[in-house]
Amino acid sequence: MSWQTYVDEHLMCEIEGHHLASAAIFGHDGTVWAQSADFPQFKPEEITGIMKDLDEPGHLAPTGMFVAAAKYMVIQGEPGAVIRGKKGAGGITIKKTGQALVVGIYDEPMTPGQCNMVVERLGDYLVEQGM
């Protein structure tokens, strides 16, 4: 299965009539493996900040997390594994696997829990596959 198929079929899938606004899978170095058509352009320093927060949980909390120049308030995640962010009526979930970052961005009416479920389910599967 291609990385694009994971994005199209597993991240951009419909959940209770809703779907993510955009999604992507990155390498730990920030290389885009696959993304939805309207996924925002990450800056290299944003990926660096995300990886640092995954290595040193709490790094982004004081300043917020920037994604494509949009600021997200960092909310509780799983130290070293998941970062969650909130911005207005939407937010972001980032799941770290052995080799990748699985990213989902949502807006209302999708809920934070639905975004978390979609992103973390694929991330957990990739971890089980050694990815």
Curated annotation (Swiss-Prot):
Reported modifications of this chain: Phosphorylated by MAP kinases.
Main location: cytoplasm
Pfam families assigned: Profilin (PF00235)
SUPFAM superfamilies to which the protein is assigned, alphabetical: Profilin (actin-binding protein) (SSF55770)
One GO term describing the cellular component: cytoskeleton
Keyword set, alphabetical order: Actin-binding, Allergen, Cytoplasm, Cytoskeleton, Disulfide bond, Phosphoprotein
Recorded GO MF terms: actin monomer binding
Short motif (Involved in PIP2 interaction): ranges: 81-97
Modified residues (Phosphothreonine): 111
InterPro entries: PFN, PFN_euk, PFN_sf, Profilin_CS
Family stated for the protein in its record: Belongs to the profilin family.
Role noted for this protein: Binds to actin and affects the structure of the cytoskeleton. At high concentrations, profilin prevents the polymerization of actin, whereas it enhances it at low concentrations. By binding to PIP2, it inhibits the formation of IP3 and DG.
Miscellaneous comment text of the record: The variability of the residues taking part of IgE-binding epitopes might be responsible of the difference in cross-reactivity among olive pollen cultivars, and between distantly related pollen species, leading to a variable range of allergy reactions among atopic patients.
Subunit composition and interactions: Occurs in many kinds of cells as a complex with monomeric actin in a 1:1 ratio.
Protein's recorded name: Profilin-3
